[in-house]
């Protein structure tokens, strides 16, 4: 799916997005964000959507939230409440300098973007050495057959998500990132919470 198609899809999704995802995503979001190191000062949220992560962010941090969809970001404004800077931009071409963030959140975004490997590469680029990357999304595991999920992939892509992304395939392209925690998060482990650290 192209970013133009994503824009159209999320214009439709935006009014119902919260109702669709809050139920299964609230607890994993909170659990992931609770792992943000106390020393973190600059946090980037890639794929911020309607701002469902914002209530869980720590105090006294500089928070930047990015999304490609204007329709989604408009709904994030009340949750930002002056504590989060909102940026409309492409996750595959981040408008930030290298190593500028202590922590990056990627919740329900890698299975949405057209090229998840590019989005992960960009997240790694703007994460400082020693920084933390927190991911929550649906992934297949290496070698997992999951015929129904693979069969649904073309249909789900038309609905602005994918069901056939293997995270380990993405990670092999990023040797500077170490996976330090991998927890099942929802739907029998299809959704996972991942914590990664960038090597110094």
List the model feature ranges, each with a label.
Residues 117-129:
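A short glycine-rich, Lys/Arg-flanked "PGG" loop and its adjoining helix->strand segment in the class I
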Residues 103-115:
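A short SAM/SAH-binding and catalytic strip from SAM-dependent methyltransferases
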Residues 42-93:
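Class I SAM-dependent methyltransferase SAM/SAH-binding core
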Residues 92-104:
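A short acidic, Gly/Pro-enriched loop at the edge of an enzyme's catalytic core
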Residues 1-13:
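N-terminal, positively charged/glycine-rich alpha-helical extensions of SAM-dependent methyltransferases
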Residues 4, 20-23, 134-194:
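C-terminal alpha-helical "lid/dimerization" subdomain adjacent to the S-adenosyl-L-methionine
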Residues 23-41:
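Conserved alpha-helix/loop element of class I SAM-dependent methyltransferases that forms part
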Residues 42, 130-132:
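Short glycine-centered segments of the SAM/dcSAM-binding site in methyltransferase folds
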């Amino acid at each position: 799916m192209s970013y133009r198609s994503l824009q159209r899809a999320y214009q439709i999704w935006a009014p119902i997005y919260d109702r669709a995802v809050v139920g299964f995503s609230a607890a994993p979001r909170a659990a992931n964000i609770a792992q943000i190191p106390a020393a973190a000062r600059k946090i980037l949220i890639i794929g911020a959507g309607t701002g469902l992560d914002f209530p869980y962010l720590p105090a006294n941090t500089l928070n930047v939230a990015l999304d490609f969809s204007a329709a989604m970001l408009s709904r994030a404004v009340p949750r930002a409440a002056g504590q989060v800077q909102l940026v409309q931009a492409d996750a595959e071409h981040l408008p930030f300098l290298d190593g500028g963030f202590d922590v990056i959140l990627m919740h329900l975004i890698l299975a949405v973007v057209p090229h998840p490997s590019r989005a992960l590469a960009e997240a790694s680029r703007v994460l400082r050495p020693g920084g933390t990357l927190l991911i929550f999304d649906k992934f297949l595991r290496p070698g997992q057959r999951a015929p129904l999920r693979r069969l649904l992939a073309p249909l789900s892509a038309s609905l602005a998500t994918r069901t056939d992304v293997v995270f380990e395939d993405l990670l092999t392209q990023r040797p500077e990132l170490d996976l330090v925690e991998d927890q099942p998060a929802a739907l029998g482990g299809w959704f996972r919470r991942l914590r990664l650290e960038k090597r110094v």
